[in-house]
Amino acid sequence: MADSNSKHQDSLQSICYKRGSLQLLDQRKLPLETVYLEIKGADDGWHAIRDMVVRGAPAIAIAAALSLAVEVSNLEDFIGTSDDAASFLNSKLDYLVTSRPTAVNLSDAVTKLKGVISNAAATAFEAMSVFQAFLEAAEDMLREDVAANRAIGLYGASFLQSHIKDSKNLSILTHCNTGSLATAGYGTALGVIRSVHAEGILLRAYCTETRPFNQGSRLTAFELVHDNIPATLIADSAAAALMQAGRVDAVIVGADRVAANGDTANKIGTYSLALSAKHHHIPFFVAAPLTSIDLTLSSGQEIVIEERSPKELLNSRGGLGEQVAASGICVWNPAFDVTPADLIAGIITEKGVITKTGDVFDIKDFIHNATSHCCK
């Protein structure tokens, strides 16, 4: 991967793609430097995802698909049948999905792309037809993510206005980064905050620093300042005190994977926020596209939790700086935790807000109704 010094009109555009070319904003260097890395194929894409150049469940899925799209676009000579092309693509996708195991969006995207590849191979007479079908499907994912995020924002803002008492002066707390830098654009939880701000009813957004990789202080604060949204950065450990002081009306977070019962895996520290919100009678929402929901998992106990390098805690700047902890100390560094569904008031999606019937979510029924209505 090579650094790109080209200027980009929108410094918050994490994914810059045109057919045959992909550049990813190196989020490890934000907010002090804006550096784009050239991605030439699936191997570059895998390392960019694994090394946190790009992060955020939706962005990871799109970056993976487009990294392979770039490789396919620049294949000079491919000798083989349509079945050979399908085998080539499927092997690359299997490799890409190993880069980050917790985010369901990546595995969901791979499954969908494999379906496109299979259908194309069954009817195509040549390899290029299979490659073309894959390219179009990967590029569609980029466009669809932005549209889904804007819908999440609108549904979330509308729901908050109708369900929170003082809905004309909302203060919202969020965690990690769920904005343009974590998606193809606009964002999920941060997209809701953007929509609330656009409606003129946001008093203040609060963002946690989100240790140890500091996605909140480095990325979310950067986006909020960029958009001139009234915002305050807090230490992770200050969240409960902020709620106790009566300065939070709602907590909204993103999701890397949502189980069928509503249990949600998200950035480490989310569970603590949900517990504090419950204690202080503050509604806690998850904002995520339907692609983040994994109906194959009955509960959060089945979600695989990725563990990150000890260096993220032993060294400053999320492992990129100098050593700050004593040599020889043991480290436990899970990247995510699971928030039980009983702590979640609603799940904001691009098809509406999933609320509980009684004390439980019926996510499967919601998705069935939402997708069947859109197809009529």
Curated annotation (Swiss-Prot):
Any one Gene Ontology cellular component term annotated for this protein: nucleus
Reactions catalysed, as given in the entry: 5-(methylsulfanyl)-alpha-D-ribose 1-phosphate = 5-(methylsulfanyl)-D-ribulose 1-phosphate
Main location per the UniProt record: cytoplasm
Record site: Transition state stabilizer: 176
Keyword annotations from UniProtKB, A to Z: Amino-acid biosynthesis, Cytoplasm, Isomerase, Methionine biosynthesis, Nucleus
EC number: 5.3.1.23
Protein's GO biological process: L-methionine salvage from methylthioadenosine
Localization (cell): Cytoplasm; Nucleus
Residues at the catalytic site: 256
Protein's pathway: Amino-acid biosynthesis; L-methionine biosynthesis via salvage pathway; L-methionine from S-methyl-5-thio-alpha-D-ribose 1-phosphate: step 1/6
Family matches, as InterPro entries: IF-2B-related, IF-M1Pi, IF_2B-like_C, Initiation_fac_2B_a/b/d, M1Pi_N, NagB/RpiA_transferase-like
GO molecular function, one term: S-methyl-5-thioribose-1-phosphate isomerase activity
Family indicated by similarity: Belongs to the eIF-2B alpha/beta/delta subunits family. MtnA subfamily.
Functional description taken from the UniProt entry: Catalyzes the interconversion of methylthioribose-1-phosphate (MTR-1-P) into methylthioribulose-1-phosphate (MTRu-1-P).
PANTHER family the UniProt entry points to: METHYLTHIORIBOSE-1-PHOSPHATE ISOMERASE (PTHR43475:SF1)
Protein name from the UniProt record: Methylthioribose-1-phosphate isomerase
